[in-house]
UniProtKB/Swiss-Prot annotation:
Name this protein carries in UniProt: Glutamyl-tRNA(Gln) amidotransferase subunit D
Keyword DNA-binding among record annotations: no
Subunit structure: Heterodimer of GatD and GatE.
Region spans: Disordered: 53-84
Species of provenance: Methanosarcina mazei (strain ATCC BAA-159 / DSM 3647 / Goe1 / Go1 / JCM 11833 / OCM 88)
GO molecular function terms listed in the Swiss-Prot or TrEMBL record: asparaginase activity; ATP binding; glutaminyl-tRNA synthase (glutamine-hydrolyzing) activity
Enzyme Commission number(s): 6.3.5.-
Family recorded in the similarity comment: Belongs to the asparaginase 1 family. GatD subfamily.
InterPro entries from the UniProt entry: AsnA_fam (IPR006033), Asp/glu_Ase-like_sf (IPR036152), Asparaginase/glutaminase-like (IPR006034), Asparaginase/glutaminase_AS1 (IPR020827), Asparaginase/glutaminase_AS2 (IPR027475), Asparaginase_C (IPR040919), GatD (IPR011878), GatD_N (IPR040918)
Residues forming the catalytic site: 95, 171-172, 248
PROSITE patterns per the UniProt record, alphabetical: ASN_GLN_ASE_1, ASN_GLN_ASE_2, ASN_GLN_ASE_3
Gene transcribed to yield this protein: gatD
GO biological process: amino acid metabolic process; regulation of translational fidelity; translation
Catalytic activity: L-glutamyl-tRNA(Gln) + L-glutamine + ATP + H2O = L-glutaminyl-tRNA(Gln) + L-glutamate + ADP + phosphate + H(+)
One Pfam family here: GatD_N
Length: 425
């Protein structure tokens, strides 16, 4: 029986029937992806295999168009409803825009913004949507240039009259992109990042709920850059996280994203669409649109570990890097052996921001001698800023000014909600 990767087949073995799409398989075997999301493998000579059309009926070559070929699929219906708020969906790729590629068995970014809209019909009741593909990549391939291209596209959509923006994005580096846009754009409307932990063809996919909740936030009064993702492992509500205070805290759970050193801005109830807020936020229209691009890519995070060779800092200084984020222990400490190397970096006009590996809590280098020595060497306390956010902030600040003293001053300011005045327990 002839079949190829991507074909739908019915397999019978010992009276049990299995259906699914053919995946890459070893010679003499067939592996299928079943509707449940699980894979099943069989020895070809021990099963009966029947090719199926997409509707599950056995293929006979007579109802699929000329010469047994499938008729072209009808054009996707545009999801649009005039009179509702105008929301632009900008797709960059990631799991929310992914499905299984049956040529390789891997998850690939194959959907566009319009595909997402067509796949989730509930969206058309919320807003009048416009889809725009910015890229189709997994988020590990995003970089500072990608952030700036995305930011420009967001600004263009707002200037064109969008009442809200949704950015579909891979979850692994979504916090970096959200932070980058938080620093680059002052926005009068919501800019909502959303993704999913599980691809659209898996029964446990979180893409639909996350997208629907993101749409609710995109038409809300919350005019900030935010991340909207599952609040629990159940399909009950999503949390709204400030773009500079959010972090992915689990590799695969649907509720992987958490606000750190802050409460979420609020929650969105999946069933009712009700938004509850917990902390102050910038309201719709409170700020005029401002766009300040510019990112210095030659910045890095250095994680201190016991016994680590401090000369690694010299590698960055001699390599022409412009700024460093140190992940210190506890309150923000490194070994005393690192102090001269920090001083050399600062003397080379390289800002050095200190954050904590603890994530929760605030850096305070005025308690112990080592911390005081770090400050004397010129290190900058990152307060309660996340290391990843500190890196993006550093890149953005150095993209705005070449003056060392001005950069140091800006890095100590709360520019986009990345620093809280008081530490949250």
């Amino acid at each position: 029986m002839e079949f190829k990767q991507g074909d739908r087949v019915r397999i019978e073995k010992n009276g049990t029937v299995y259906e699914g799409k053919v995946m890459p398989s070893m010679e003499g075997y067939i592996t299928i992806k079943m509707k449940s999301g699980y894979n099943a493998g069989f020895s070809i000579d021990k099963v009966s295999i029947t090719p199926l059309e997409n509707n599950g009926e056995a293929a006979n070559g007579g109802n699929g168009g000329k010469n047994g070929q499938k008729e072209p699929e009808p054009a996707k219906e545009k999801v649009s409803k005039p009179g509702l708020p105008k929301v632009s969906i900008l797709s960059t790729g990631g799991t929310i825009a992914s499905k299984i590629d049956y040529r390789t068995g891997a998850v690939t970014s194959q959907f566009t913004a319009d595909d997402i809209l067509a796949a989730i019909p509930e969206l058309k009741e919320i807003a009048d949507f416009k889809g725009r593909a910015i890229s189709s990549i997994l988020s590990e391939n995003m970089d500072p240039d990608s952030w700036q291209n995305l930011a420009r596209a967001v600004v263009e959509e707002i200037e064109a009259g969008a009442d809200g923006i949704i950015v579909t994005h891979g979850t692994d580096t979504m916090m970096y992109s959200a932070a980058a846009l938080s620093f680059m754009i002052e926005t009068p409307v919501p800019i909502v990042f959303v993704g999913s932990q599980r691809s659209a063809d898996r029964p446990s996919s979180d893409n639909a709920m996350n997208a629907i909740c993101a749409a609710r936030v995109a038409i809300s009064d919350i005019a900030e850059v935010v991340v909207v993702m599952h609040g629990t492992s159940s399909d009950d509500y999503c949390e709204i996280h400030r773009g500079t205070k959010v972090r992915k805290m689990h590799t695969s759970r649907r509720d992987a994203f958490k606000s750190v050193n802050s409460l979420p801005i609020g929650t969105v109830d999946y069933d009712t669409g009700e938004i509850k807020t917990f902390i102050e936020y910038t309201g719709r229209g409170e700020k005029s649109l401002k766009f300040k691009p510019g990112m210095e890519p030659k910045c890095a995070i250095v994680k201190f570990t016991p016994g680590a060779d401090p000369s690694v800092l010299d590698c960055y200084v001699d390599g022409g890097y412009k700024g460093l984020v140190l992940e210190g222990t506890g309150l923000g400490h490194v070994s005393t052996k690192w102090i001269p190397f920090i001083r050399r970096a600062v003397d080379a006009k390289m800002p050095v921001i200190v954050t904590s590996q603890c994530l929760n809590g605030r850096v305070c280098d005025r308690v112990y001698d080592t911390g005081r020595d770090m400050l004397k060497a010129g290190a900058i306390e990152g307060e309660d800023t996340l290391p990843e956010t500190a890196l993006v902030k550093l890149m953005w600040v150095l993209g705005q000014t070449d003056e060392f003293e001005k950069a140091v001053s800006m890095l100590g300011e709360n520019l986009s909600g990345e620093i809280n005045e008081c530490t949250l327990r």
